[in-house]
Structure formats: structure tokens, C-alpha cells
Curated annotation (Swiss-Prot):
Coiled coil: none annotated. It is an enzyme of class 6 (ligase). The gene is rimK. This is Probable alpha-L-glutamate ligase. GO terms for cellular component: cytoplasm.
Length: 464
């Protein structure tokens, strides 16, 4: 009984610190259901020091703040297979370091893991609390809060490391999740990241000195450009990408690849020519052809897609022939180009999305449309979950990206009775749904792919 009284009562979340890691404050989720403790770590690299294996890593201790970085080094005491929140097993490095909580200090073991998709940068498990702490789930920060002012004094924003690349993100809306993640991921790795609003870029056509300007500044010193666009502005964005190429600047997806994938009709024709199966699809330029067009794809129900659709816009399920004719005539009256496509009933509204980077499928999710909706893009309230793909699906995704010449692409696949069918290939993958569903640092993988193409290597920590 006296031993229980000596234990400290803590809440479901608490502020703590790691003096030897240089982390003065980090909020932890307290979970007795988890055996091990874990801390958010990125850019994890091992190295040798005095004949022992060490690990260097970076911690973003504050939630929703990637500019605050603490760089750490500790000896590796173990490597363990841990099951993550998605139910997948992964191998993690284990370190031992002193934890400070309410003026008490003791050593705990921490696994290093990317916790970007989690609500907390740290998880305090039961092994670290054994014989010391008691949890009251009704409490939060029972040992005291840390103010924003205190955090501001404790941490300083780090400047970009010298020797990194200069990378431009060519897009329209800087505040979008994917653009923010790419900017943050690049800065984490020591690169100078620039957001380039497509509408504020202009170019100079010249045989000897081609140029691109942005807000009056000449962009001739970029190492790489990553173009993230919607299909409605593909022509101008493609022209800008082509101009960067003529200046000798590396573009992650070439202008020709962006152009091909941005034209849905042309891309489907190219994919079919390469032997890739798609749902039966029709296209016409006149509403007079609506009835025959509907029969061409097997009749209603069928799918109607706007050629210029993006971020989940466009796909509509027409359940009857009359509804299909009405929709086709309406869109044609509005001079909107569209495709009609066979409806795959057995798919039950589920679409497989594979993310391809440099010839590898690095992540895959299954997207399910919200009730009453057809599009399952996460921008439209659809649900995403991690899924293991088959060799046939993997081969299809890789071939589709290769046919269109894309180094970075999302490939949408639908499963039919005849096997997997390709729906669409996008040169500007939406990152939010796939990062949240998989817990993977997809933005970091994209930046890493640029580093590999340009043969840039991250400086290793100095060995003593």
C-alpha cells in the first residue's frame, strides 16, 4: 500500500523532457496498453562510433510545427519488430535515455518511429511507468501545462542547413496539405524550398538564354522543380516545366509526361496501346450521339467523367439511360468534354490507389466512396484504408506509370470480374489521404527521390 502511495498520479497526456537529447519539452500520450515508449523521429541514420553502432535522428517535438528541429545521437541498444497503429509490423531502432517528469529523472527505452500521422510526438508506454506512475484517464496534464511563451523560449527555429539543394514546388495553392508537406519535408532534409505560384510565373523564350521569372526574380539557380497541378491548368504548367527543362533544371515529372497524363483521353489511348486493360470507355463531341454512346459501353448504369476533372470532381453515376442522356446533353450544352465509362458493379465503390516513385510502389490504399457518392477521392469525404496489393496489381501500376513516363504518380485501379482494370494515372498525387492511412512519410520519399536523381547525399554526423 505504501508503495502505491509513492507513485505519482498522471493524466492521459503529460509534458516531459529528455535532457540528454536536448528536448526541453514534448507532450506525450500516456498509454498503459502500449508496452514500449516511442518518440517521433525522422531522417534516421546509423553510424559507427568507437566500434559501436549509433543512430542519428531528428525530432520535431511540437505538434503542427516542422520548423522546430532537434538533432539527436544515441547508441543503439536494440532493433525490435513493433506493430504500428495500422496493424503493420516494422523494425525500429531502440535507444535508452533519461526521461524527466515532474523533477524526477530515470532511464527509459524509446523506439524511433515517424509519428507524423499520430496526434502526439511521443507515446509513454507501461514499461517506462512501471512502479513509478499511476494513470487517471480523466486527467490531462496533471503535472502542469507548458505555455506557448515557454515553448518559444525553449526552442529556436533552425535555419536551413548549408549545402542542400534548391527545389521549387510549382503549384497554385501553397496552403494545400500536399504542398505544405513537400515544403516541410525538403526543409527537414536541409534543402532550400521555394513555392512557385504558377499564375505568377512568366517566361522568356530565347535560344541562348531561356528564362523563367517569378515575381520579378530570375529562377536560374534551381536544382529541381516538382510540378503539382490540376488538369485545368496543365497547358501553362507544362509550358513552364518545358522551359525549366530547356534551362537544364531537373523536373521530377517531365513536361511531356505531365501533358500525356493530364489529357485523360490521350492517356487512356496510350495505355490501351501498351496492352493495359481499362473499363470500356466512350467519347463523343455531340449530344446527338448520346444514345449510341451509352449503348457502346454496355448501357446504364454507367459512369460520366469530365475530362478536366481533378481532386475527385467529375465522376457521376447515371443509373438509368434517361439520366445518362440528360447528363450528357447538359454537359455538352455547357461545352464540357466528357467520357462515358462502363460501371463496374462488383467493385462496390472501392478503388485501389497505388503511389509510384521511381519505379517502385511505395504505398497503396483502398478508397471507398462516401454513402451516395461515386468518387472516392479523400477530398470528397471518401474513406481510405491501407491495403496489401497483389503482384498483378503492382505490375499494372508500375507499367501504367512507365508508359506515361512518370517518375512520380498515383495510379487508380478497380477490380472487376475480369481482373484489375486501370482507371486513371495522375502526375500530381494527393498526399493527405495516403499519408494518414499508411502513416508513411510520402513527402519525404518524394524529396529523397529528387536527391537520388541529383546524386545528393545527406551529410553524415561527425564521428568521434
Amino acid at each position: 500500500m505504501s508503495q502505491d502511495i509513492a507513485k505519482k498520479i498522471i493524466g492521459s497526456e503529460e509534458w516531459c523532457s529528455f535532457p540528454e537529447l536536448g528536448i526541453p519539452a514534448i507532450k506525450a500520450r500516456v498509454d498503459s496498453g502500449a508496452k514500449t515508449s516511442s518518440i517521433h523521429a525522422v531522417n534516421i541514420q546509423t553510424f559507427q562510433r568507437d566500434g559501436e553502432e549509433w543512430v542519428s535522428f531528428e525530432v520535431h517535438p511540437l505538434r503542427i510545427d516542422r520548423r522546430t528541429v532537434v538533432r539527436c545521437q544515441r547508441p543503439v541498444i536494440d532493433k525490435r519488430i513493433i506493430k504500428n497503429s495500422s496493424g503493420n509490423s516494422e523494425t525500429r531502432f531502440v535507444i535508452r535515455t533519461p526521461l524527466k517528469l515532474n523533477k524526477k529523472v530515470w532511464d527509459i527505452e524509446l523506439t524511433l518511429s515517424n509519428r507524423d500521422a499520430m496526434g502526439f510526438r511521443m507515446l509513454l508506454g507501461r514499461e517506462a511507468m512501471m512502479d513509478r506512475l499511476i494513470i487517471d484517464p480523466a486527467l490531462q496534464c496533471a503535472l502542469g501545462e507548458v505555455s506557448k511563451e515557454s515553448l518559444g523560449k525553449a526552442y529556436t527555429k533552425e535555419e536551413t542547413r548549408k549545402g542542400g539543394l534548391k527545389i521549387g514546388i510549382l503549384a497554385c495553392n501553397e496552403s494545400l496539405y500536399g504542398n505544405q508537406r513537400l515544403l516541410e519535408a525538403g526543409r527537414e532534409r536541409g534543402h532550400e524550398m521555394l513555392f512557385l505560384d504558377i499564375k505568377q510565373c512568366y517566361l522568356k523564350l530565347d535560344t541562348l538564354e531561356p528564362e523563367v521569372h517569378y515575381k520579378g526574380r530570375l529562377l536560374n539557380d534551381l536544382d529541381a522543380v516538382l510540378t503539382k497541378i490540376g488538369s485545368n491548368i496543365t497547358p501553362y504548367a507544362t509550358a513552364l516545366s518545358r522551359q525549366f527543362e530547356s534551362m537544364g533544371i531537373y523536373t521530377c515529372n517531365s513536361s511531356s509526361a505531365i501533358s500525356q497524363s493530364g489529357d485523360k483521353l490521350f492517356s487512356l489511348q496510350l495505355l490501351l496501346k501498351s496492352g493495359i486493360n481499362i473499363p470500356i470507355t466512350g467519347f463523343a463531341n455531340s449530344p446527338i450521339d448520346a444514345s449510341d454512346l451509352i449503348e457502346m459501353v454496355g448501357g446504364a448504369p454507367l459512369i460520366i467523367k469530365l475530362l478536366e476533372g481533378g481532386q475527385g470532381q467529375g465522376p457521376i453515376l447515371a443509373k438509368t439511360k434517361n439520366a445518362a442522356e440528360s447528363l450528357i446533353n447538359t454537359f455538352k450544352f455547357l461545352r464540357a468534354n466528357l467520357l462515358v465509362q462502363q460501371f463496374i458493379k462488383e467493385a462496390n465503390g472501392k478503388i485501389l490507389r497505388c503511389l509510384v516513385i521511381n519505379g517502385k510502389v511505395v504505398a497503396s490504399i483502398e478508397r471507398t466512396a462516401a454513402s451516395g457518392e461515386l468518387s472516392s477521392n479523400t477530398h470528397q469525404d471518401g474513406k481510405s484504408s491501407i491495403v496489401k496489393i497483389t503482384p498483378e496489381e503492382r505490375s499494372l501500376a508500375l507499367k501504367a506509370a512507365k508508359v506515361l513516363g512518370l517518375q512520380i504518380a498515383s495510379v487508380d485501379i478497380i477490380n472487376s470480374k475480369a481482373g484489375p482494370l486501370l482507371l486513371e494515372v495522375n502526375s500530381s498525387p494527393e498526399l493527405e489521404g495516403i499519408e494518414i492511412a499508411t502513416g508513411k512519410d510520402i513527402a519525404g520519399m518524394v524529396i529523397s527521390s529528387i536527391e537520388k536523381k541529383l546524386q545528393w547525399k545527406r551529410p553524415l554526423p561527425q564521428q568521434s
